[in-house]
């Protein structure tokens, strides 16, 4: 069904189109993550998790043409332990001239050395966004997450280097309680809609819908079951970013954590006491004795710097000056939505 208002509003709120029966316009069909055909491995403890992750990595590496994306965090560091010696590990490094931004390459290099991997840096520039966003949104049939540019560029480099598969640590946070902010308290429905929405659509769009069903279906006696929301709704959105970027680059993607499932109820008391991803951390500490797990950081992308001077959207669907008080992430979502609407005009 064609519904530009719904799709625009839903993207700003959730970074995806939750109702997969809807599209922006006739002839441009969004691509979504297709669930795996086999059921996920049930994980009760860190030993179950280790066994499943190791098998997934070994399976992906059988052909000898597999690389890994290695950040400074613990999720990909764990996977690196299972890679064959001499494998290539890519780390993203965003570059903003004259400004120091988050740099994970130093910590990632330590993991690479520990695991006997060849460490390579993929530098990301603003010009990559201008160059690759049109390609990514055309392939996706929808606006895309900002991380897709980095994933796509790494995929292109990996293909150039002779690889056919790249491994990511995606979905560990979703399945094992890494999203501490979302799990920090019990949320009422209205509270969580406000908390989760990336951009409230009425802040940007003249015609909008409040898309609440992705959250209200996880309501239990007035409270939102956030863990279930994360590992269903957020999981599909997040995995869709990796599959779209890698498909567009012409490389297979493997996300071993995505093939697992926390079998027992998540211990929210431990998460809220500062012990997020307690099963994953236990595994990291076992594989890297003596290492101190670094603070969790999102995939680096200095959108605050890149969008600091952006004047906002010019299309008639948007309110003038709507991005004036938005942060960099919010400005990016409005910017890429406008880019996608421009693309749709060429497809009529």
Q: Regions from the language model: what does each represent?
A:
Residues 46-68, 157-163, 238, 342-343, ...:
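Phosphate/ATP-binding catalytic cores across multiple sugar-kinase/actin-like superfamilies
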Residues 105-139, 170, 213:
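A conserved beta-strand->alpha-helix junction
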Residues 26-38, 43-46, 52, 77-82, ...:
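Hydrophobic transmembrane helix bundles of membrane-integrated enzymes that assemble
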Residues 171-189, 228-324:
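Mid-to-C-terminal catalytic subdomains of enzymes
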Residues 59, 65-115, 120:
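ATP-dependent adenylation/pyrophosphate-handling site
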Residues 187-215:
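Short, flexible loop segments at boundaries between secondary-structure elements
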Residues 2-7, 13, 165, 319-348:
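Acidic, carboxylate-rich catalytic segments that either coordinate divalent cations
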Residues 1-65:
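RNA-binding accessory domains that recognize and position tRNA/RNA substrates
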């Amino acid at each position: 069904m064609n519904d530009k208002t719904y799709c625009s509003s839903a993207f700003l709120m959730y970074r995806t189109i939750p109702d997969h029966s809807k599209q922006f316009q006739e002839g441009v069909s969004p691509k979504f993550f297709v669930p795996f055909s086999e059921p996920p491995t049930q994980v009760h403890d860190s030993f179950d998790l280790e066994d499943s992750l190791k098998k997934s990595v070994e399976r992906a590496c059988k052909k000898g043409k597999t690389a890994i994306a290695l950040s400074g965090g613990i999720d990909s560091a764990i996977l690196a332990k299972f890679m064959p010696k001499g494998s290539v590990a890519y780390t993203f490094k965003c570059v903003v001239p004259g400004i120091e931004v988050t740099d994970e390459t130093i910590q990632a290099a330590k993991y690479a050395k520990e695991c006997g991997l060849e460490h390579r840096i993929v530098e990301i520039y603003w010009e990559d966004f201008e160059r690759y966003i049109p390609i990514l949104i055309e392939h996706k049939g929808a606006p895309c997450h900002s991380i897709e540019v980095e994933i796509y560029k790494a995929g292109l480099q990996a293909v150039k280097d002779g690889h056919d598969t790249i491994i990511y640590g995606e979905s560990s946070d979703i399945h094992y309680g890494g999203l501490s902010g979302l799990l920090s308290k019990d949320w009422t429905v209205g509270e969580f809609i406000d908390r989760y929405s990336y951009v409230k659509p009425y802040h940007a769009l003249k015609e909008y819908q409040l898309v609440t069903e992705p959250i209200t279906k996880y309501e239990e006696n007035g409270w939102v079951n956030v863990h279930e929301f994360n590992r269903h709704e957020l999981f599909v959105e997040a995995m869709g970013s990796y599959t779209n970027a890698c498909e567009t680059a012409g490389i297979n993607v493997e996300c071993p954590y995505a093939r697992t499932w926390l079998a027992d109820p998540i211990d929210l008391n431990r998460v809220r006491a500062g012990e997020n991803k307690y099963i994953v951390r236990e595994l990291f500490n076992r594989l890297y004795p003596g290492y101190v797990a670094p603070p969790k950081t999102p995939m680096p992308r200095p959108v605050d710097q890149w969008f600091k001077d952006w004047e906002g959207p010019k299309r008639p669907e948007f309110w003038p000056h709507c991005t004036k008080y938005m942060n960099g992430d919010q400005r990016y979502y409005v910017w890429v939505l406008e880019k996608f609407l421009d693309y749709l005009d060429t497809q009529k």
